[in-house]
Design a protein with these regions (language model features):
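Conserved beta-strand hairpin/beta-sheet module of binuclear metal-dependent hydrolase folds
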Residues: 1-6
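Cap/insert and terminal regions of metallo-dependent hydrolase folds
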Residues: 8-103
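C-terminal regions of proteins
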Residues: 98-116
Length: 116
């Protein structure tokens, strides 16, 4: 698959992380990734929860915020899996569970809450 049709290109995210030297938080998509039964072997322009956590590490983000889930059913993963997997896998990628943030529907937080 062409590089531009993938959600995560490690080389690019590593380069950005190295160039800027880290960020407070990254907002990254965590859903609409399971297209295997449709004939695609890769995530096709979206990222898995694990890829989002890896992207956060590449960007040297202190916290990662999972986004782009529970909106539309665009692929074949179970609708509630992405936020669950995102939190469950946080520690594998060097994040504390509290540093992998999932907002509830309608939840609002200010930047001070996110950066503490």
């Amino acid at each position: 698959m062409a590089w531009w049709r993938q959600g995560y290109i490690k080389k690019i995210f590593d380069e950005v992380g190295n160039k800027i030297g880290g960020i407070s938080f990254a907002i990254l998509g965590i859903a609409a990734y399971d297209f295997k039964k449709l004939g695609f072997n890769e995530t096709y322009m979206h990222t898995t929860p694990s890829q989002a956590l890896e992207m956060g590490k590449s960007l040297k983000a202190n916290k990662v915020i999972g986004s782009h889930f529970l909106t539309f059913v665009l692929s074949l993963e179970k609708v509630l899996d992405p936020p669950k997997l995102f939190k469950e896998n946080a520690e594998k990628y060097g994040y504390k569970k509290d540093d992998a943030v999932i907002f509830k529907i309608g939840e609002v937080k200010n930047l001070k809450e996110l950066t503490n």
